[in-house]
Regions:
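Sec-dependent N-terminal signal peptides
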Residues: 1-3
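N-terminal secretory signal peptides
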Residues: 5-75
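Primary mode marks residue(s) on the alpha4-beta5-alpha5 output face of response regulator receiver
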Residues: 19-36, 42, 83-137
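Extracytoplasmic, post-signal-peptide low-complexity/disordered regions of secreted/exported proteins
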Residues: 51-53, 61-62, 68-71, 76-100, ...
Length: 137
């Protein structure tokens, strides 16, 4: 039996019929909507999820990263402080530890929205199913 997802405003999609590239495209569309719904629901802009393009070290191929505004801000401030000799450059693990309270607030905001919004829960469910399908290929 084929897995069918009902995607907002797009009807039904049979996941098994999608190529890896098409799956990635569907994931991108759902992620964009998921983050937009979340960002519209919050009052604290520091919790907003920001997506941006970057070029990984050693590559010429652009990649996209999506992360909370507080992570982007802290990483930038830490890099400037390290460059000026005021602080050590934080590793990703150190950054997560330093920002534990902010991550807890983000988790609470997402949980609250999930409890209040069936649409947000549906987007999350579709996104999980698409990612699982892509990972299984």
């Amino acid at each position: 039996m084929a897995s069918t997802l009902t995607l907002a405003a797009e009807g039904q999609v049979v996941m098994e019929d999608l190529t890896r590239s098409q799956l990635r495209g569907e994931i991108k569309k759902i992620e964009t909507e998921f983050y937009q719904v979340f960002n519209r629901s919050i009052e604290d802009e520091n919790l907003a999820i920001i997506c941006y393009d970057y070029i990984p070290t050693g590559s010429n191929i652009k990649a996209e990263a999506c992360e909370p505004q507080f992570v982007t801000d802290k990483r930038g401030n830490n890099a400037n402080d390290a460059r000026l000799g005021y602080d050590l450059l934080l590793t990703p693990t150190d950054l997560q530890s330093v920002l534990a309270a902010e991550y807890n607030a983000l988790n609470a905001a997402m949980s609250e929205l999930s409890a209040q919004s069936e649409y947000f829960r549906e987007l999350n469910s579709i996104l999980s199913a698409l990612r699982e399908e892509l990972a299984s290929r």
